[in-house]
Curated annotation (Swiss-Prot):
Extracellular-side positions: 34-42, 87-101
Organism the protein comes from: Debaryomyces hansenii (strain ATCC 36239 / CBS 767 / BCRC 21394 / JCM 1990 / NBRC 0083 / IGC 2968) (Yeast)
Glycosylation sites: N87
Keyword Thylakoid: no
CDD domains: SH3_Sho1p
Function statement: Plasma membrane osmosensor that activates the high osmolarity glycerol (HOG) MAPK signaling pathway in response to high osmolarity.
Membrane-spanning residues: 13-33, 43-63, 66-86, 102-122
Membrane disposition: Multi-pass membrane protein
UniProtKB keywords: Cell membrane, Glycoprotein, Membrane, SH3 domain, Stress response, Transmembrane, Transmembrane helix
Coiled coil: none
Designated name of the protein: High osmolarity signaling protein SHO1
Domain SH3 stretches: 244-304
An example Gene Ontology biological process: regulation of actin filament polymerization
Amino acid sequence: MSFSISNFIGDPFAISTLSFGLIAWIISIAGAGASNQDKFPHFSWWGIMYQLVIMVVITVLYLYNTIELYKFTLVGLLSIAFVYSTNSTNHLIYKTGDSGMLCCAAGCILLSMLNLIWILYFGGHPESPTNQFIDSFSLKTHSHNHGHLPSADNKAADGDIDDEVEYKRYSSSQGNTQFQDNNLRQSQLTTNNKSVNTPYMSSSQLNGLENFSSSDVHQSRDLTSNKRQTVYNDTNSVNDTGNVFRYKAKALYSYDANPEDINEISFAKDELLEVDDIDGKWWQAKRSNGQVGICPSNYVKLMD
């Protein structure tokens, strides 16, 4: 929000309206000065000076590129100025015997027209047809004309960029996950005692797991470490590793294990499971038939 003359001269609407307003104000002040002060309405002097202050304020806001931040304030101030200028016109227009008053009335009429234009512009939405038409003549692209509010085209462009970044992030995540799964299965085929340093995460398409972050991956446990001995080469076989499962859980939903993941187990809704190691998104679980594997934590609920 630094001072720059280019903020003002780059906007034809600002230059044209303020130039028009300055000419109308000069006509008004000249007519007021040439009028018979005994008959001239004294309150009109206040209205004329108030109009000058408004124009100075608008000029400063354009120079500092902060016009958008005060548009609602300007609408209120301009509404007052519109009342002043129209009221002065009503008192001056019928004083046909005084040319000075008629000149001042002409200036007040012009100021009333200007105030009405400003009210419609500053009070209008940036996406309205009138505002977009006026802003299209600006030499600067979205500099001060509602520059703080993105247009519909900008929103669409931003959305496309976000989608592209999200797609790249998703593709990268999928590639990393596939690489980790391949390494994990390679180690499982060679030895059951070899620890895998890369944390194992899978089935990220499940409901409730879309928003996990990289910190969650680093904090998740190694499901293939020596202390658990939970490597399963056949999901259809019944296994019992002898581990102690300290908790009971109830399945909230039915879940079908990923056929490409040998560690996952399937279960039905309301099925009772024995679970352990419940500090991550995937829990070690045991079914009633003795099958042991991992289950997504958001599909089950711990029982008291």
